[in-house]
Every structure is written in C-alpha cells, then in structure tokens.
Amino acid sequence: MKIFLTDISDMNDDIMNKGLKLVPAYRKDKIERYRFMEDKERSLAAGLLLNYATKLYSIYMSYAGEIELKTASDDIFNVKLDELVKSYDTSYDYNIEYAGNGKPVYSGLDIHFNLSHAGTCVVCAVSDRPVGIDIERPRKNAIKVAERFFTQAECDWIGDDSLRFARIWTLKEAYAKLTGDGIAGTVSKVEFRHETSANMASVVNMYISGKKADNIKIYELNIIKQKYVISAMEYIKN
C-alpha cells in the first residue's frame, strides 16, 4: 500500500480552474453538486490526488523490482496541489464502477484505491489489494460517542483522550471502507485492542465478533501536523 496526501490550504482560483478542466466528467458533476466552496475544493483535490496516486502506482507496478516508490518517511507522499495539476495525466483516469456494496473500484484492474478527507487534508490509499483509509481530527466530547458505539475495552483504553478516540474511530472507518459494508454495520462488531507483542512492542490487533483477524494489515499514521490521525488497512496476501 502507498498513501498520498494533499492539503487544500493552497487552493486558489488558478488551481481550481485548471483542475476542473482536467478531471473526468463524473468528478466535475460531483463537484458541482456541492453547495459550499470548501467541499468543492476537497472534491477537486480528491480527483487530482487519485489521478496522481494511480499514475505513480501504475508505473511502480509496471517496473516492480526495478524501481522503488519511497518517501522520506516511507509512510506517506505529501504532494502539493500545483504538482497534482502539473502531473495530471488523463490516460490514468481509468473507468470506475461500483461494487455490489457501493464501493467504487477500477473496472477490470488490479489497482485498488480509497479516499478520505478531513479539514484541509485529503488522503488516498492505493494497493494491488482492496484498501480502506480514514483521516480525522481529534475532537472534544468524543467519549460520549465512544460509550455509545465502542466496546468497554476500547472505552477503557481511550479514557478522556481525544487522540486515542480518533485512533479507534479511524480504524473502524478504515475497516468499514475496506469491506464496503459501511460504518453502521461494522462499528460495534469490530474491536481494536492495543496489545503487547512477543518482542514487547506495542501493536494494534483487530477482533471481529471476538475472533482475532489475521488477514488484514493495519497502518496507523499519527499525527500529520499534530492535527490529524490517519488509519489504513489492506488484506494480507495468502
């Protein structure tokens, strides 16, 4: 999995106008349906970022073993909006269809993607396996939500820590987006436990209906600019 991020704080009329001329018709329609400008900007950024991520990942997969796709931290690609516009390549606007559960997927390709946004940040995960990603900002009074939807063990781990709440919430959202089942159907049956591994490292494990899930890889990226929490998941290859 590779994760890409962009920040719409740098959005301006020039980038907006150029970007709208680049993105495919379905994305333009989606942008136009939004009422507020910030939502339009996030949607445009998502379209630009998806094209960029798909392009780089496609090239990477074509030359696997010959080139490396790495960042300074090897965790996330932070890409400026103007770079997304300059690098846009319509040949990577692959046809998107919707699976039976409503999850958008590329038609007939072994490239999977997922998008999320919060505040001024937009993120995109791409992989050769199904993926799910979520980004959130820690929020106050989160414990009330936790008490309603989370397990007792999760609530005990969170306490009154808004960052810990965001970590659990993004994990649940990422799983819901990985499966395409939606948060309402997964929030209560999936539990995340922060445990200690055999070598005494702190790890997060997922339990579905009380059974540990060993077929999913979890990524936690905490925190971007001390404001955001990102969690992502993909299935582990057999």
Segments and roles (model prediction):
Residues 1-238:
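Core catalytic alpha/beta fold that binds nucleotide/phospho-ligands
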